[in-house]
Amino acid sequence: MKSIVPASWLAFLALLLAVADVALADESFILATGRRDPRIYAIDFNAALKPRNNNTPNAIVSRAKVHPDRLDGTPVGDPANIVLSEDHRTAYVVNHHGAVNNAEFLQHGGRGSISVMDVGRMLRPEFDNTDRAVERNYDSGYFGAVGLVVLPDLLLVSHSENWLTEDGSNRISIIDRKTGGRRAQIEMALGHPGHACPDFPVPFVSPTPPPTVPFEAPDPRFGCWPNPEFIALGHGSDGRTYLFSGNAGTDDVSVMDLHQALMGAPVVEIAPRIPVQTGPFGIKASPNGKFIAVTARESGQADFEGNTISIIDVDRARTGAPGAEAARVRVGTDDPNGQARPFTVAWTPDGRQIIVANYRTNNVSIVDLRLALAHDPRAEVARIPVTRPADADGLVRPGRPKGTAVTSDGRHAVVSGGPRLDPTAPPSGTVWVIDLRTRAVVATVTGVGNDPYGLTILEDRPD
């Protein structure tokens, strides 16, 4: 079978797993997705830290549209995730439902898209609220796009939905970065113990009738389709790289052979899936690639939200050995039955701590890896509340944290959040900066999108 990528991806993956050890640059920026507000918000990091800018939008330098407007002037797009290229000159933005008008599209299962954006233009105030940063847009290859991994020449894009439904996906697309063409597609196995699945072939062959799937969660019929959410790359002691996905539909984590996927093989899961507390969402590899942290966000089958993160041992997972879930840590709440809805995770550069955004309990957890692997109940070493000032209507709404990132010097965590409001409402999202030494919020930026999800930190402004 002919490979669909050059050998350069191996060198890139080694670089990806290396830990950066540089100081935060003077010109550093936070790039936050606006989600229901289809723009990327560029925030001056150091301006955000100035006390006079706290609880204001003053540190926002520009807002870049992710799609050209409709001909009638309506803004479109649904940016939920953002990842930078190797040289940080290009941003790849995942639009969960593609070029939709969020005031019209009020359900799941929109066709995903990728916005390719010039980072330098995203930072220029004169291009505020324009599409001047958009270089091109292309189809993501399926429905409900969310997870994204950047490889040399290629993108891996996971999809958690099917056409106009919240259930029904088992697809991860492999997209050509230059042309936007779909070069291959990973097809994941259906089902998990106790859940019968329709007679639907994997890999797919035509003609096959479309499956009947639940419209939206919660629904007890969830459990057949994995519905992969975020994805991450882990590094085995065998020198190979493995793709992990958090499967919201089947409450587990898949491990896949990336090399086989890049050779064009559609079926690449190589070991039994690892069950977690409930449907996972955010997933991230440790800086050395040996561990995968994943959140247990919510069940698709019942009205239940999780309160744990799982730490997956890559070597045990890839070999199917017992104990692949090396640790499970309760976060966000002291109540074993409490519902925290952990959303995403980020690692500190030294790999010692994991930052967790807990949506339902409106706080951010810090988990110590060493204590977690020792099954110490004190592994959650800090729990930091995040709050918001009043919105334009005078109401003080919960923080609802979602996205997470950590600066390369390990000093600060950055968290995005905020409630989902009517798409016509003024920007209501929030970005918090947390000092990881004092474990306290040191800056709050307001007016960042509507229900913002993913974000990233840019520490070397392109020329």
Which ranges hold each PLM region?
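Predominantly soluble domains enriched in secretory-pathway, periplasmic, or organellar proteins
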Residues: 21-463
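Positively charged n-region of N-terminal signal peptides that target proteins for export
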Residues: 1-7
